[in-house]
């Protein structure tokens, strides 16, 4: 994040609400989080301290007048500067006791949320720790009214909170006292402990004096104090964020540096009751849960929060494990059909991976309820995949197209594709428009899908030698057969794994001779015929010829079109009709011989078109 975002604000109903944009940021953070929150009276410089922890001059808004800038709770996430693989989450809260708001209940909620969400709580105040400062920290005495460790109200006491509450840091701003007691120097922590010292007695006055101190001592056994001198002169306070380090008091900078180092070194990763590590995703869910509790008027219960979080995380862990399993099985599915042993082996491997993914995210699944749910769902999916593997392995009927490409040497193309697959049939006919179709019997036995089949043709070369697999999800593959001498051709299609013959036919030599005669008869023979045919159908050539590139290559190879025109029509971005117009213009201007050669090329490349045009003349 390059700047803070609002995490908790006030909704239209006047209640606190979580901002969806901030939740989305937290949902993306899978790392453990260290959460540092700052609370304190408004206009005491909380945001300045947070910006220093972020290593920035600006970020969290600073106010230069009596109106506070921060409202609700703002969040800034960044990589932890000293703990690898950890995210630092800074929470800046709105100032307490804002005279404009005048809502003590809201202040208590803000303070309670800061305590519940943070692993380190920074309390920021001005001056010294005296009775006034303690009175301003009244919210700590109210924590026990709003937060409970267990649902059993009688079981809670102040000491129970200490295990789950954050490290407490009291930052005293504009501190001017000399740290001495009875002539002896005091450390900042010793000063804090002196200020928290209890008075003996049971009078109401003594009890009122001791109450906030006793709560701090019991709620926050881990506590620290930092005393900051004034950062600059009074007239420059309004532009504090724009001042360079050279313009700030050196002692203030030294304390700030110590404070930041302490926070980075001592702040622990946030944990739930029971020791579960909090990630950004979990922090987002906790925030939503706590704010919803406030809206309902209920009391925060740490144990209930853990139970609710366990439910959320374990359901998500189940889904995560299931996705790991499904991704792997879907990949395996592309190779169906497979032996059942292979499918079962992959099921076991992926089940183990899915369980590991589940265990990495789940917590407190003590009865194994969610793990059993994951195993049950994987079992259902396995049954479905096993059934699909069996279905894919079923036999299905196919169609066959056979073409003669040329007679000397004899070259045949043999295509297989599903029965009634019009798209595949059209594709094959388009590819073979210059070939001659051969009549043949349709296969009367079904083929096994995705299983290799080999075509046996005695006395001929067949490619691919390893065979082809019959598939329903790709364009039809084909065998290429080459035979030097034209005689009877026997074909036998064999399923490779069990050597079963699924189709056989014989094509007699006379059929090939007849096909060649048909091809020869269809050709335009005399120069006069070809010249007249060109002149009659020039417009049709421009509009209907499709193999433009192949025709241009042959025309250029026979020097019918010159190099400059060939480069122009093959390298520029023009339409097929524009190219054919240029070709026809060039052929037309070159005379009868060029027209004859052009028609010869068309008889090779556009046989169907020429036959159609000849039929239209009759």
From Swiss-Prot:
It catalyses: GTP + H2O = GDP + phosphate + H(+). It comes from the Eukaryota. The keyword Nucleotide-binding applies. Residues 428-448 are annotated as: Disordered. GO terms for cellular component: canonical inflammasome complex. Highly expressed in neutrophils. CDD domains: CARD_ASC_NALP1 (cd08330), GBP (cd01851). Keywords: Cytoplasm, GTP-binding, Hydrolase, Immunity, Inflammasome, Inflammatory response, Innate immunity, Nucleotide-binding. PROSITE patterns: CARD, G_GB1_RHD3. InterPro entries: CARD, CARD8/ASC/NALP1_CARD, DEATH-like_dom_sf, G_GB1_RHD3_dom, Guanylate-bd/ATL_C, Guanylate-bd_C_sf, Guanylate-bd_N, P-loop_NTPase. One of its GO terms (molecular function) is GTPase activity. It is found in: Inflammasome. Residues 30-268 form the GB1/RHD3-type G domain. The keyword Transmembrane helix does not apply. Its main location: other. Its EC number is 3.6.5.-. Interacts with pycard/asc. PANTHER family: GUANYLATE BINDING PROTEIN (PTHR10751). Belongs to the TRAFAC class dynamin-like GTPase superfamily. GB1/RHD3 GTPase family. GB1 subfamily. GTPase that plays important roles in innate immunity against S.typhimurium pathogens by mediating formation of an inflammasome in neutrophils. Neutrophils are recruited to the infection site, and then mediate bacterial clearance through the Gbp4 inflammasome-dependent biosynthesis of prostaglandin D2. This is Guanylate-binding protein 4.
């Amino acid at each position: 994040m390059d700047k803070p975002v609002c995490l908790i604000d006030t909704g239209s109903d006047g209640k606190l609400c979580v901002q969806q944009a901030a939740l989305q940021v937290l949902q993306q953070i899978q790392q453990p989080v260290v959460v540092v929150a700052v609370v304190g009276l408004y206009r005491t410089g909380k945001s300045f301290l947070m910006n220093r922890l972020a290593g920035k001059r600006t970020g969290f808004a600073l106010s230069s007048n009596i109106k506070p800038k921060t409202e609700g709770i703002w969040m800034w996430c960044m990589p932890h500067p000293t703990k690898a693989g950890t995210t630092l989450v800074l929470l800046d809260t709105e100032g307490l006791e804002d005279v404009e708001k005048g809502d003590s209940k809201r202040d208590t909620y803000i303070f309670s949320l800061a305590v519940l969400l943070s692993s380190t709580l920074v309390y920021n105040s001005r001056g010294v720790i005296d009775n006034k400062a303690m009175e301003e920290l009244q919210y700590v005495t109210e924590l026990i009214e709003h937060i409970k460790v267990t649902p059993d109200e009688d079981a809670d006491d102040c000491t129970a909170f200490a295990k789950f509450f954050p490290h407490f840091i009291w930052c005293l701003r504009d501190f001017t006292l000399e740290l001495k007691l009875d002539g002896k120097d005091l450390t900042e922590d010793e000063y804090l402990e002196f200020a928290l010292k209890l008075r003996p007695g049971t009078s109401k006055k003594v009890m009122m004096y001791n109450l906030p101190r006793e709560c701090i001592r019991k709620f926050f056994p881990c506590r620290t104090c930092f005393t900051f001198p004034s950062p600059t002169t009074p007239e420059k306070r309004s532009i504090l964020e724009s001042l360079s380090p050279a313009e700030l008091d050196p002692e203030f900078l030294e304390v700030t540096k110590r404070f930041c180092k302490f926070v980075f070194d001592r702040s622990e990763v946030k944990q739930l009751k029971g020791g579960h590590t909090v990630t950004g995703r979990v922090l987002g869910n906790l925030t939503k849960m706590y704010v919803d509790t406030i809206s309902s008027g209920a009391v925060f219960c740490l144990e209930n929060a853990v139970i609710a979080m366990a439910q959320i995380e374990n359901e998500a862990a189940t889904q995560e494990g299931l996705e790991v399993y499904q991704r792997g099985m879907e990949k395996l599915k592309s190779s169906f059909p497979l032996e059942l042993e292979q499918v079962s082996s992959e099921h076991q491997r992926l089940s183990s991976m899915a369980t590991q993914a589940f265990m990495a995210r789940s917590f407190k699944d003590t009865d194994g309820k969610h793990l059993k749910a994951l195993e049950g769902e994987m079992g259902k999916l396995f049954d479905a995949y096993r059934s699909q593997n069996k279905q894919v392995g079923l036999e299905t009927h196919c169609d066959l197209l056979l073409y003669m490409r040329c007679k000397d040497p004899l070259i045949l193309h043999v295509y297989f594709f599903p029965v009634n697959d019009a798209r595949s049939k059209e594709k094959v006919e388009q590819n073979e428009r210059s070939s001659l179709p051969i009549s043949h019997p349709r296969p009367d036995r079904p083929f096994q899908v995705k299983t290799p089949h080999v075509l046996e043709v005695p006395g001929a070369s067949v490619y691919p030698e390893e065979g082809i697999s019959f598939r329903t999800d790709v364009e039809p593959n084909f065998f290429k057969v080459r035979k030097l001498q034209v005689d009877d051709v026997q074909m036998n299609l064999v399923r490779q794994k069990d050597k079963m013959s699924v189709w056989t036919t014989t094509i007699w030599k006379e059929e090939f001779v007849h096909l060649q005669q048909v091809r020869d008869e269809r050709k335009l023979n005399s120069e006069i015929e070809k010249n007249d045919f060109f002149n009659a159908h020039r417009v049709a050539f421009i509009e209907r010829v499709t193999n433009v590139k192949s025709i241009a290559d042959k025309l250029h190879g026979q020097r019918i079109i010159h190099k400059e025109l060939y480069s122009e029509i093959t390298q520029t971005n023009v339409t097929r009709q524009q190219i054919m117009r240029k070709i026809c213009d060039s052929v037309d201007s070159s005379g009868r011989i060029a027209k004859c050669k052009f028609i010869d090329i068309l008889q090779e490349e556009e046989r169907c078109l020429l036959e159609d045009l000849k039929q239209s003349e009759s």
